[in-house]
């Protein structure tokens, strides 16, 4: 994995921007089963549509306002309910957008499929979390912890996709 990250300041709003790549197919490593772009895409969409498979502490997810390339979700973690919108760019990108709500600042996660060569496949995870300058100092010390949690969650996601692919469940979704 390669990591790129940083914090960028614009117009008195601090945006924690963090991104990293996870290599899906490595032609030099025969121990890893290769996934097709279609399998990977199906898995990333499954993560958005069935998040309880990927987030064990999620209590409930309700999906509504579905269009051809987007849907709204209401995620419940105990008493906390978070609303987000998922935008799909087929076979390329899944983007989660959380509008500011209650004590939660606006944020986004973009997962982009990258194919630098015919034999390689990556997912780029990009996080943006905007908060105002007043809360910046309080949040700064937590950013490293959040980055680490994001990476672990993303590694777990890809691990789950590999497991589902090995069981043929991602191929079944394609039919």
Predicted regions and their residues:
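Beta-strand/loop substructures that line and gate deep hydrophobic ligand-binding cavities in soluble
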Residues: 101-152
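Hydrophobic ligand-binding cavity/cleft-lining segments
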Residues: 11-62
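N-terminal amphipathic/basic-hydrophobic helices that include classical n-h-c signal peptides
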Residues: 1-12
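Beta-strand elements of well-folded, non-transmembrane domains
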Residues: 24-26, 77-79, 127-131
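Hydrophobic residues positioned within well-ordered beta-strands of beta-sheet architectures
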Residues: 18-20, 71-73, 84, 96, ...
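Hydrophobic/aromatic beta-strand elements that line small-molecule binding cavities or substrate pockets
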Residues: 58-62, 82-87, 107-115
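A conserved amphipathic terminal alpha-helix motif
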Residues: 138-175
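Glycine-rich portal/gate segments that line the openings of hydrophobic small-molecule binding cavities
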Residues: 63-102
